[in-house]
Amino acid sequence: MVNNVTDISFKNEVLESDLPVIVDFWAEWCGPCKMLIPIIDEISKELQDKVKVLKMNIDENPKTPSEYGVRSIPTIMLFKNGEQKDTKIGLQQKKSLLDWINKSI
């Protein structure tokens, strides 16, 4: 299961992480976001020693998505060494995400 990150915990969990971090920005009402849940869960398990995978509900945590320019969801961002390195927008296939993550880390 993927852990949640909040506006309050974002700095500690993401920006100060020793591992690269994938953040899935989502909302409860978003159909494609719900379709992405099992894919994100699988990726989290498969890459648990290489990356940290977190989810952020944009309705409960509006500050961070606004700061990073999240305009549509699902949006998946990769952070490394405290910086945003890359972004994917929309529903993604597992293979596409794995290739993107492995290339980026």
Swiss-Prot record:
Domain Thioredoxin: start-end pairs: 1-105
A GO MF label: protein-disulfide reductase activity
Disulfide bonds: C30-C33
InterPro entries hit by this protein: Thioredoxin, Thioredoxin-like_sf, Thioredoxin_CS, Thioredoxin_domain
SUPFAM superfamilies recorded: Thioredoxin-like (SSF52833)
Keyword terms of this UniProt record: Disulfide bond, Electron transport, Redox-active center, Transport
Entry GO terms, CC: cytoplasm
Protein family: Belongs to the thioredoxin family.
Functional summary from the UniProt entry: Component of the thioredoxin-thioredoxin reductase system. Participates in various redox reactions through the reversible oxidation of its active center dithiol to a disulfide and catalyzes dithiol-disulfide exchange reactions.
Protein name per its UniProtKB record: Thioredoxin
Lineage, opening ranks: Bacteria, Pseudomonadati, Pseudomonadota, Alphaproteobacteria, Rickettsiales
Gene this protein is translated from: trxA
